[in-house]
């Protein structure tokens, strides 16, 4: 028996490696995906005043920092029984949408596109964003513009483009001025067009690689996502499980997550393996993120994105189970995010100064959930009577996907090593 070790994994938001164990015939026998960095944020926040935590947890991820900021402050609001004003909720949602635009553009164009635009057999020295700029400069310019637009939204609403600070218990610390709104709104229509161009691009690229898409990393799993009245939603928090055959849907609220999600400790990893409790481990492992979201929802929230979702399911089937279809799904979500940004920017509430409710620290337990760029993100805090965090649990989006990524790598390895 031998081993193939891939370390480090490149173009990854974090640190990891893959170990493929081969049998006596040189065929894959076992695959393990190792997340090699100990993070420890669940312990970092214990003993801290809860109002400090939304400024600490964005450091979990330099790309998804806004999602952590908002899941955190939503958890504190829930723990203290706070109902925030509607304009504050819309501001938070706009901030979150800005992060989705930035991250989805970065994820596809900077991390995934080099393999598709330049081809998987291209020299690794040029198979990167610089190579994309050289081969497809117009595509690269649109990608950069989308990222810039998303970051401008986060900066205007969140106070900073990286690690925003304006989400506070009870609402928002900063209103959006009319001038800031108008500055963002003038670019909204163009960004929708750029996002649509992204979907058309991935459809063209998929045609070249459809054999690989439909044979590598194809696995049947459960799916978990966020919906609001059955519609795809980035921010509001009804969670929905979908069965592998697409026939069973189970919905639950954030505060019920421990009744539905278990975490299995594996000895070779710094992350636990989440699973659907009703089914058990490992049969109940599930996927989150764009592919899962398009499967889980009944329809998209915005019209253009819904047209693209219907087309997506015609191509890949329902539920779509191809791991390489994540890129297509992500670009459909990018269209929805740009459409949603325009809707929120045109809402009169978005420049309201009614953005803060009074709060009093107290003992409580609260759960905050958002759909982060990589999938469902859960923050759960318990506070004492002084508002100090005494216990914290976080299930980060990528953590949900680790066991199913492992399964997908194993399936792909078996196909490649035939």
Curated annotation (Swiss-Prot):
Additional remark text: The large subunit of Vhu is split into VhuA and VhuU. Each contributes two ligands to the [NiFeSe] center.
Transmembrane parts of this sequence: none
Protein family per UniProt: Belongs to the [NiFe]/[NiFeSe] hydrogenase large subunit family.
Cofactor(s) for this UniProt protein: Ni(2+)
Record-listed E.C. numbers: 1.12.99.-
NCBIfam families for the chain: VhuA (NF041785)
One Pfam family here: NiFeSe_Hases
Quaternary context: The F420-non-reducing hydrogenase vhu is composed of four subunits; VhuA, VhuD, VhuG and VhuU.
Disulfide cysteine pairs (residue numbers): none
Keyword Oxidoreductase: yes
Keyword match Oxidoreductase: yes
Listed name of the protein: F420-non-reducing hydrogenase vhu subunit A
Signal peptide bounds: none
Residues noted as binding Ni(2+) in the record, renumbered to the chain: 61, 64
Top-rank EC class of the record's enzyme: oxidoreductase
Keywords in alphabetical order: Metal-binding, Nickel, Oxidoreductase
Domain of life of the source: Archaea
The species this protein was found in: Methanocaldococcus jannaschii (strain ATCC 43067 / DSM 2661 / JAL-1 / JCM 10045 / NBRC 100440) (Methanococcus jannaschii)
Gene3D superfamilies (alphabetical): Cytochrome-c3 Hydrogenase, chain B
Lineage of producing organism: Archaea, Methanobacteriati, Methanobacteriota, Methanomada group, Methanococci
GO molecular function: ferredoxin hydrogenase activity; nickel cation binding
